[in-house]
From Swiss-Prot:
GO biological process terms held by the UniProt record: diaminopimelate biosynthetic process; L-arginine biosynthetic process; lysine biosynthetic process via diaminopimelate
CDD domains given in the database record: M20_DapE_proteobac
Gene: dapE
Annotated protein name in UniProt: Succinyl-diaminopimelate desuccinylase
EC number from the UniProt entry: 3.5.1.18
Residues that bind Zn(2+) 2: 111, 146, 360
Sites where the protein binds Zn(2+) 1: 78, 111, 174
Amino acid sequence: MPKTLHLAEQLIARPSLTPDDAGCQQIIAERLAPLGFSCETITSGPADFRVTNLWAKRAAAPVKSAQHTTKLVVFAGHTDIVPSGPVQQWRCHPFTPTQFDGKLYGRGAADMKTSLAAFVVAVEEFLTAQPDTALAIGFLLTSDEEGPALDGTVKVCEALQARGERIDYCIVGEPTSLERTGDMIKNGRRGTLSARLTVKGVQGHIAYPHLAKNPIHLVAPALAELVGVEWDRGNAFFPPTSWQISNIHSGTGASNVIPGAVVIDFNFRFSTESTPESLQTRLAAVLERHELDYELAWTLGGTPFLTEPGTLVDAVVDAIKQETGLTTVLSTTGGTSDGRFIARICPQVIEFGPPNASIHKIDEHINVADIEPLTNIYRRVLENLSAGLSA
């Protein structure tokens, strides 16, 4: 059995529901230690939500001359998975990795345990061929990416920053491809800014509206205006910033009572053309103009990041072309990832992994034919980066 497939099956068999790593990181650490990696477990979070993080690093070989330098490339990812959903609806048990019709089924097969396995095997192959590389290699893994993401990658990044650790390049193994492995990579992500808006009125009998103030009616014109705002026009790398309402809560449950308040949850997905502060200011101005009695609580989930074409992007694009013949598409679409935390301490961050059509679904799977190319691409990226150091 191919090494990556075998390791992927070992990881899929572990029911690592957030925040339980279920031993996945130990399996990986045991593969990395013989290669010269120092492996450190960093735990965080309250007693009832204990998160396991792994930081593993192999130092570069000493440089031969002043003209040469060393760089640190980090593979980042998560060992945690989302719940399987109804087990009886699966083709196989979600934690019994099963091959059928050319596909490997199991929770985490695409998101993202196969990427983790491919990371490890790619590094094994690369270091076997180039044990004296000037490229330092790291692994940053967490069991808190699919959950609140408060005690995972962000905590490791804070610890590394406090130590003065410099990361030059980072590849996050998120499933970014669409139809074939390598057809799309993410060279950035939009920021996410959420808020809960509470608009106050006066509760009363629905037959006597003159004795009450309906907060839903009061806020409706403001919402209509906000829906029509052009927050920005995006740019060459990002689509325009979007504003979307996710939830509206109001009422007592009775059909004859005007509610006393309405609570509205909304979210911005914003480009580098806007800032959290500018969006907050502009939205508050609309609410003030409509003379609403309101409270607003903001939560910044992450700021946008962008890695423009350069050393890392070029190394990945070239590796994909070498392995698959595909000309990959650079994209910043989709949701957030832990790349937003890593970008704070690393100037070049990209995300690349297998097709994502089945992630978080019943019968999550990856095409077996995609597994070896994924491993080879990761290895070729290391080769490209290493070659650049000795050129």
